[in-house]
């Protein structure tokens, strides 16, 4: 289990459901495995980006990337539909493209200590950004921007 200060706002939401004994119903309603969301809630597993996308209208995506005690900007977003995460259509991807166009992909990666190969794989669509990648880019791109279209 996580230390109390390491809990994100998204985990706190799941822990609240556990306390009220409503997590099983929540999992049935949103088509998730109880064991899976339980493990995410206690911090044993990180939430995959696809899970954050599927729950975006229930738990704001930024809630997964900021720990309790950190302020979370719950930005407004369009009520887009769809169950499949198409990150190349997201605001976050567009912002990453504009940053890379201005600085160059290798320069951006070098300046901020990012792995160039991982950045290239995301830019070319060969690999989706993981939870940890989205966390590492959060100083440049708001995490919720990866989960909503413009």
Model-based region annotation:
Residues 7-11, 23, 48, 52, ...:
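Short amphipathic alpha-helical segments that mediate assembly, nucleic-acid/protein binding
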Residues 44-56, 126-138:
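Short, basic-rich loop-to-helix N-cap that marks the start of a DNA-contacting helix
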Residues 1-23, 29, 74-103, 111:
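A short, Lys/Arg-rich alpha-helix, primarily the initiator
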Residues 59-80, 141-150:
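Short C-terminal boundary/hinge segments that cap the last helix of small helical domains
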């Amino acid at each position: 289990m996580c230390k109390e200060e390491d809990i994100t706002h998204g985990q706190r939401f799941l822990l609240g459901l556990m306390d009220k004994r409503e997590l099983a119903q929540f999992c049935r309603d949103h088509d998730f495995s109880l064991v899976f969301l339980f493990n995410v809630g206690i911090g044993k597993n990180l939430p995959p980006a696809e899970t954050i996308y599927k729950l975006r209208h229930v738990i704001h995506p930024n809630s997964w990337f900021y720990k309790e005690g950190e302020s979370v900007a719950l930005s407004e977003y369009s009520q887009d539909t769809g169950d499949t995460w198409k990150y190349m259509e997201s605001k976050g991807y567009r912002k990453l493209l504009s940053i890379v166009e201005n600085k160059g992909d290798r320069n951006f990666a070098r300046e901020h200590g990012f792995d160039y190969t991982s950045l290239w794989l995301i830019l070319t669509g060969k690999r989706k950004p993981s939870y940890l990648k989205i966390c590492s880019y959060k100083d440049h791109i708001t995490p919720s921007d990866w989960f909503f279209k413009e």
